Amino acid sequence: MSSHEHVFAVFDISSSSVAGAHVLSRTDTCPNALILTSVRIDAVVTDDINIQRFITQANRSLEQVISTIRAQDVHKPSQIQISLASPWYSTETRIISYRSEKPFICTKKLVESLVDTEIADIKKTDGPFGSYGKDSVIIEKQLSGIKLNGYLTHEPYDKKATELECTLTVTIAPKTVLDLFSDTLRRSYGARPIRFTTGAFTAFIVARDRLPIE
């Protein structure tokens, strides 16, 4: 395999199914991705709703998906990415406000400091997952809007204001579930970097990058 080629293992875990694929990525061609093999296994539907059984079944489906795609493709992925769908994560939106009687300069450092403080506060609270466990992990964070003196702006830095408002969106997942999925992947693929993402943030990034800013 050339230095321009990399193989990734990609998984999609939702409430209704688990899917997986080995994807060959090339940096010297367009299109630059080729699906080498893929499979999807539907979840087992039962009338008896039991959280622990639900988690166990999802992990068992993940094991089956891994076994199938590894049997169909001999490549050894260098990285692993998992996209989580509901109910495996929760989305929270926080409004961060900063005010001063005297005008101040809005800087990237100031915004990052406010975001870091808010993230630290989120980490101190119990996760919203009930039976999934209290410990949670922040998967993604994104500033979805910044207002100066009440007006939304796409270029806030180096401008004077007396009021700053940031809209912060984070996705959170139960640590016990992430650890379970990660352990299953490492048993099959070894010590590969594992990255978790969510369907919500994937859609946001695609929309942000494709739609014009007005």
Q: What are the residue ranges of the model-derived segments?
A:
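Nucleotide/phosphate-binding catalytic cleft detector across ATP-hydrolyzing
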Residues: M1-S17, A21-Q79, L84-E214
